[in-house]
Amino acid sequence: KLRKKNFKVKKIDGDIFRKKNKTTKFNKKSIIENNLSIINYIDKIHNNYDFVIVSVISPLKKTREYAKKKFGKNYFEVYTKCSIRELTRRDTKKLYEKAKKNIITNLIGFNSSINYEKTKYKKIIVNTDKETISVSSNKVIEKINLWVKVLAGKIKLQFM
């Protein structure tokens, strides 16, 4: 939707980033390293784009707060909720299947000792096994509209 409105958008997939950096573990140290690496990469490129959208599992408050501090009012989180049952059903990478067989350990939300650490920061919550893609994406677009109004002087993006 943003590209259709001629915004320059960069999408970053945390899993692809993880592979490029050859980070294969899901322990706390590796998660922090991967998330900080993504944040530092974004810091180098964000001025070239109107929006940088990152999809990454970021369960640790420390890294999310670091990103918020680094990017300030240009940062907001989308917390995606989904049941393990639904995640397993959708799992195109077969991560949950591998986790069930202990091929992968510490898969966040499944067999991990790492839990999601809550922050006081207000974020968008989308519940992808209870909401349609349209409802979830509209929540994000509404936040972007608000963000644009605050930062750019009452401009409103219209998405249908």
What are these regions (language model features)?
Residues 12, 53, 76-78, 124-126:
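Hydrophobic/aromatic beta-strand patches that form the interior of the parallel beta-sheet core
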Residues 19, 62, 85-87:
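Generic structural signal for helix capping and beta-alpha/helix-loop junctions
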Residues 28-39, 61, 81-84, 130, ...:
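Amphipathic alpha-helical transducer elements in NTP-driven molecular machines
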Residues 81-84, 89-139, 146-155:
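Small-molecule kinase domains that catalyze NTP-dependent phosphoryl transfer to phosphate-bearing small molecules
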Residues 29-74, 97:
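Glycine-rich phosphate-binding loop used to anchor ATP phosphates in small-molecule kinases
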Residues 1-40:
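Conserved substrate/cofactor phosphate-moiety recognition/catalytic segment
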Residues 71-76, 119-123:
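Short glycine-/polar-rich loops that comprise or flank the Walker A/P-loop
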